[in-house]
Structure formats: C-alpha cells, structure tokens
C-alpha cells in the first residue's frame, strides 16, 4: 500500500475510495469521480504529499469539464482564507447555525457577565431551552490542530457564566452548553477532555459524518472566498450582513451596486452561485 504524507506530517495509506467520495461531494458524477481516482492512483508514489494529491484531483475536475465541482472541491482552502480582521469565520458560523434552527448573535454587547469576570463570546446560539456559548477557532493553515487549552478555557468560561446566572448577576445569560468550532481539527487531548467535560466540538470531518464540512455542504452555505472575491469586497459585504454565497444570492442588486458591484458583475456572481448550490443545473 502506497504511503502518503498528510499536511500535519502524519503518514497514512493512499485510499482511492476517499477520492471518489470527495469528488462526489463536490458534485461530479460517480463515473467521472472513478476515472479521476484511477488517474490519481496511477500517479501516486511512496511519500507523495496529500497537498499534491488534492492539486491533481482539482486539476482533473477542471479538465473533465466539471469546473463548478472543482470550485466546490476547494472548500477547505476557501474556509482557511477567511479574514480574522473582519471576523469572517465568526460571522460565517453565526449564519450557518441559523440554518440549523438557532437564533444567533455574534460577540454580544455588553459582555456576558460571569460570577468572577465578564466574557467576550464569539457566538451565542439559542434554540428552544438551549443557550450555547461558542468559541470559533480559525486557522489559516488547514493542518493546524486546535489544542487542549481551547476547550479547557471554554469549559471554564461556561462554569463562570453559569455561576453568574445563578447569582443573578447583571448581564448574565442562562448558558446551557459550551461549543468549540474550528476549520481544522483537534488534538487527541482536546477531544478526550471535551468528551469528559461535555464540551461539544465541531471541526472538519468531526464528528464523523456530521462535521463542519458536511454542515456547509448540506445547506450549500459556501463562504464568499470560494467564489474568488477580494478581501476589500468581502469586507463591504460583511458590513452589510452578507456572510456567505446564499446571502449574496438573495442580496438586492441596488444594495450591491451601492457598495461597488456593477449590475453585470453581480449577475455573473449570482449565476455562478446558482450553479454551485445546484450541481444538477445546466
């Protein structure tokens, strides 16, 4: 079995079926995906990097005429390019959870008061009797692990907020659970600690079958970076509560023109989005 080197330095077996599954998720037909997997299988060699394999797959999707699937295949890279200075990842997660039935708020003001100190919360999500405090941990390098310290701090934050609420502290909230959301993955110790302390983790392919990537794909709520928008363009959109491609698709053309998008370009972008969210569309 050919060994490949993952971006975090770990060694793994080459898995042809993973290629098929990932291509299918991107929207290509199973027949095309099988051909691409065969092609890659013929090109891999001992010690090849997973990054080189991803580049091969992306290129083969393009040359096979599946340009929209090729765009979707770059989802992980697009998420990593969200800009921390304009809090894109936090806003993106805030909007994503709304599709899941939550009422969400980013960085509530005034800060949430605990028993001991006040706390800046990335996202507060409410659904029925559930009130969740969420820490959004974004990494530019998509092989960077989120370590033990993050869920430990989040559990301590929840403990203090719960204490503040029980004491009737002003600006407290009735927090019922704590989450950490990251665009990469977690260290083994972070996972073990979170299971023990009931801190919910969401990451790329974690929990298995219900990870952040599956959630994005289920709702077709792709980031604005996936359609090639520049940082200054995305900043204008974020300031107008447009956080993902679905928001942009629904945006009024007059608003888009006012913030610098000519009608013709706005329509081209919306046409691209329509194809991305509906792979079967011609």
Regions found by a protein language model. Name each.
Residues 1-82, 89:
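Long, C-terminal-biased catalytic regions of enzyme "large/alpha" subunits
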Residues 18, 92, 189, 232, ...:
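Short Gly/charged-rich anion-binding patches and loops
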Residues 10, 24, 182, 225-226, ...:
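Residues marking the start of alpha-helices
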Residues 3-5, 9-12, 203-205, 211-213, ...:
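Short leucine-rich amphipathic alpha-helices used at interfaces
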Residues 31, 57, 61-221, 238-241:
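Intrinsically disordered, low-complexity Ser/Thr/Pro/Gly-rich regulatory segments
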Residues 209, 214-282:
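Compact, charge-rich alpha-helical regulatory domains located at protein termini
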Residues 34, 108, 251:
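RNA-recognition motif
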